[in-house]
């Protein structure tokens, strides 16, 4: 969340920056609440000061033997205490209203982020690789998977429902190989530590990374557990929409040493999304699923290092595509297409031949101190007593299912076989083709 000081001391400037995102900050309401807060705060401080001053008189009166006078002072202090309690309740109520507003406010975009309404206003930064030309009729990944008896959507519908998949044989192995290759690359060459994390998280974790309270409808939630451990309340947990949630929350409520930063972590997990609001979009194939695998990259940095870290992290995701020899483009998201908590985001879009277009395969974001403030994730500089908020970054390195789509479609041959990228062949038992 944003620093509340910005809303107290730079309200108009903050509103103007948020307006670039198409977000209208309720300046009038915030201004009124801030005036109330300051007024009540002054009353609280005056009451505390008066109470403290009068309290000193009790000892003096008792020393002088004036018990009656001391008793009157005690009654006066009791009355002041009651007034103080009332004012504290009023102050808490105003602060709660301000907090509710702050939680609904997105992050401020970086100055270099282009203004825009949606994906059509994103800025293309670069392209890598050239889409192939084919002298035969292209098939999409669904047809290729069904021809090879490797993608079984019908069984998934029977077992669960739409937007799920059953993979078999060499297709399942390819899916596993892609994830293993990504993990090996990021841990052995890019300096990340592999993490195994829970796939179910609590509300505090989802709040920390910004999914709650605003985006609860996008998640799959468990029902409260009926079994209780001792006298604990039943827990409501949620399936992770991305490994960003559990991995980033590893630094929640912690103070890291400056020497330990940056922290670079990666995890391969399934991800679960309800895809609320996407009815009718990408209903065919693996592009938009309720359950999909992803290798996530997370970095925790010092504030002055986070922008360079974003370039590095994005480059790590790009390296995966380059080694797989998949054409892609890199775009800088405009203000209207950025995620709620993002300060700056690059998307990588891979070429999908059957759709004759580029599709998102990775989103790499610098969240600035937005998540860190929610999580109270801090670090302490050498020689300093007061800790500072870290900066958090995350990105897909990559989405496994969409990578598989790109491999199947870009590497298809006239006879329906799929050429396995060279870097994956050792994970496929030396096979060069599927089919």
Curated annotation (Swiss-Prot):
This is Serine--tRNA ligase. Catalyzes the attachment of serine to tRNA(Ser). Is also able to aminoacylate tRNA(Sec) with serine, to form the misacylated tRNA L-seryl-tRNA(Sec), which will be further converted into selenocysteinyl-tRNA(Sec). The gene is serS. It catalyses: tRNA(Ser) + L-serine + ATP = L-seryl-tRNA(Ser) + AMP + diphosphate + H(+); tRNA(Sec) + L-serine + ATP = L-seryl-tRNA(Sec) + AMP + diphosphate + H(+). It is found in: Cytoplasm. Gene3D superfamilies: Bira Bifunctional Protein, Domain 2 (3.30.930.10), Serine-tRNA synthetase, tRNA binding domain (1.10.287.40). It comes from Vibrio vulnificus (strain YJ016). Belongs to the class-II aminoacyl-tRNA synthetase family. Type-1 seryl-tRNA synthetase subfamily. The keyword Transit peptide does not apply.
């Amino acid at each position: 969340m944003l620093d509340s000081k910005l809303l107290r001391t730079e309200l108009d400037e903050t509103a103007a920056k948020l307006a670039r995102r198409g977000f209208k900050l309720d300046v009038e309401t915030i201004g009124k609440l801030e005036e109330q807060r300051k007024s009540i705060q002054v009353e609280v401080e005056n009451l505390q000061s008066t109470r403290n001053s009068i309290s000193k008189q009790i000892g003096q009166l008792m020393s002088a033997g004036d018990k009656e006078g001391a008793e009157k002072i005690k009654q006066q202090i009791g009355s002041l205490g009651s007034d103080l309690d009332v004012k504290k309740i009023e102050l808490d109520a105003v602060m709660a209203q301000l907090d509710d507003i702050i939680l609904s406010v997105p992050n401020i975009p970086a100055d270099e982020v282009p203004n825009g309404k949606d994906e059509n206003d994103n800025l293309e930064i670069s392209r890598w690789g050239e889409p192939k030309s084919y002298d035969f009729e292209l098939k999409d990944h669904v047809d290729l998977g069904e021809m090879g008896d490797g993608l079984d959507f019908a069984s998934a519908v029977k077992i669960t429902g739409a937007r799920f998949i059953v993979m078999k044989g060499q297709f399942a192995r390819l899916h596993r190989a892609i994830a293993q290759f990504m993990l090996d690359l990021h841990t052995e060459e890019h300096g990340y530590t592999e993490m195994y994390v829970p796939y179910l998280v609590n509300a505090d974790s989802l709040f920390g990374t910004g999914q709650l309270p605003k985006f609860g409808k996008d998640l799959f939630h468990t029902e409260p557990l009926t079994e209780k451990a001792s006298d604990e309340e039943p827990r409501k947990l949620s399936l992770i929409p991305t490994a960003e949630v559990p991995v980033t929350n590893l630094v929640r409520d912690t103070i890291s040493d400056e020497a330990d930063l940056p922290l670079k972590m990666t995890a391969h997990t399934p991800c679960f999304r309800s895809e609320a609001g996407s009815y009718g979009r990408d209903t065919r194939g693996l592009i938009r699923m309720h359950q999909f695998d992803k290798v996530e990259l997370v970095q925790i940095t010092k504030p002055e290092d986070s922008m360079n870290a974003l370039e590095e992290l994005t480059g790590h995701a790009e390296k995966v595509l380059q080694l797989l020899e998949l054409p892609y483009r890199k775009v800088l998201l405009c203000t209207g297409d950025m995620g709620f908590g993002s300060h700056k985001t690059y998307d990588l879009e891979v070429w999908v031949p059957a759709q004759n277009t580029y599709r998102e395969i990775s989103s790499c974001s610098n969240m600035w101190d937005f998540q860190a403030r929610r999580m109270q994730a801090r670090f302490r500089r050498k020689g300093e007593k007061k800790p500072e908020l870290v900066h958090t970054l995350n990105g897909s390195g990559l989405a496994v299912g969409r990578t598989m789509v790109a491999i199947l479609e870009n590497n298809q041959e006239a006879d329906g076989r799929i050429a396995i990228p060279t870097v994956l062949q050792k994970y496929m038992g030396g096979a060069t083709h599927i089919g």
